[in-house]
Amino acid sequence: PFEIVVSRNNLVIDLGTLTDEYEKEISIHTTATSKDGEKTILAGKEVTIVDTVKLDGLTKGTKYQLKGWQMLKEENAELLIDGKRVENDYTFVADDEEMKVEISYTFNASALGGKNLVTFEELYDLSNPDEPVKVAEHKDIEDDGQTVLITERIIKIHTTATDKDGNKELEAGKDVTIID
């Protein structure tokens, strides 16, 4: 700390003591992938997106809660499945200024083929459990690191049509049976 004195015409103005302490800013860097680390996931009844979140600037010993949810990139809207937001949270006590945590989101993505999903996060300080304070967020709909593509499930069917004896050539007639 240091003192600054401002004076003019023998009048001194006391500005108090100045310090150059600053409040640390918490940064969030994330990568959303499949369980296998892929950026594409095949549409299905039960898919899981794993969000790996690197946090920097935490206060050791402080209790935090990381909340996350899925967004539809093209619509810039929350992903709702059966009317409910696809979300999850993780509560932890910081054991270091830098930490890496994972949050998983498992949901029915059967109808989401061709959609890009983006994970959004908010970090809350729970020092006062009655009044959580948001200390950081990462909500960028254009962030490729937070984006996963749900791909269409393509089912290929191969068939062979024959008559009842297995022949591929039939004679036109009134009572013809084709077996596929």
Kindly label every feature range from the protein language model.
Residues 1-180:
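Solvent-exposed loop/turn and edge beta-strand elements of beta-rich ligand-binding domains
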